[in-house]
């Protein structure tokens, strides 16, 4: 996290007004910049967030190319270090919107299917462990693992990138599991950047 990030952005934003550059009052200035789309100043401060997710959702997150990432490597480390593979929630496909799913699968059906998934995952991790015991390289053994396998990401970006990422991925059409992550990230952002949060009208989101 950039120390005193909002104060730093305000200081840099006043680069052309050196007589007033050290003015600690930055709320109005940053609010003006957000309102009028002067985004470059928000590239002057950064935040890093640790994210625990699955390989399937990580692939969506890694598409945001304005960020830099460091991810747990299944080539170099045993995947068991991050815990058991979680059985996913099950939702039905929205027939009108391919980017949407509906939480309307009957409970009995969900339980039956999740039991099958749990058995499938158990067989997959047993095979992975056997391959490792047989001396197969981790970079090869990992190919038997499902997209639900846990992973850990460190995601670093400018305040500008975080604002647009949170706006985009909070919207309808983002997968629920990804939206859950964004809600947690937004809570962190609100704590660390209260002035920006107020200007963005995110206080009650």
PLM regions and their residue ranges:
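Family-specific signature for flavin-dependent thymidylate synthase
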Residues: 1-205
